[in-house]
Amino acid sequence: MEPVDPRLEPWKHPGSQPKTACTNCYCKKCCFHCQVCFITKALGISYGRKKRRQRRRPPQGSQTHQVSLSKQPTSQSRGDPTGPKE
């Protein structure tokens, strides 16, 4: 390896940047284009802001699952709660 100028920042070292720009393509060649492409495209890791998903609302006429659970009878405890008598 050839010596690198110590005054250069690490991201400006020769060979640290690919000669071509990154693309939005997800083919194998583009996924291994550079370290950033590999992390975002091949591994699927992105640290950007996540888009908030809209909650899917149930139709007006249907009941929610939570309401149907509250109408169920409570389970009866079996046996004496204080323990067996001997």
Swiss-Prot record:
Zn(2+) 2 binds at C25, C27, C30. A motif (Cell attachment site) lies at residues 78-80. Residues 1-48 are annotated as: Transactivation. Residues 48-86 are annotated as: Disordered. Changing W11L: Unable to insert into membranes upon acidification. 95% loss of transactivation activity. Zn(2+) 1 binds at C22, H33, C34, C37. It comes from Human immunodeficiency virus type 1 group M subtype B (isolate BH10). Keywords: Acetylation, Activator, AIDS, Apoptosis, Host cytoplasm, Host nucleus, Host-virus interaction, Inhibition of host innate immune response by virus, Inhibition of host interferon signaling pathway by virus, Interferon antiviral system evasion, Isopeptide bond, Metal-binding, Methylation, Modulation of host chromatin by virus, Modulation of host PP1 activity by virus, Phosphoprotein, RNA-binding, Secreted, Transcription, Transcription regulation, Ubl conjugation, Viral immunoevasion, Zinc. Residues 62-79 have a biased composition (Polar residues). Residues 38-48 are annotated as: Core. This is Protein Tat. Residues 1-24 are annotated as: Interaction with human CREBBP. Signal peptide: none annotated. One of its GO terms (molecular function) is RNA-binding transcription regulator activity. The record marks W11 as: Essential for Tat translocation through the endosomal membrane.
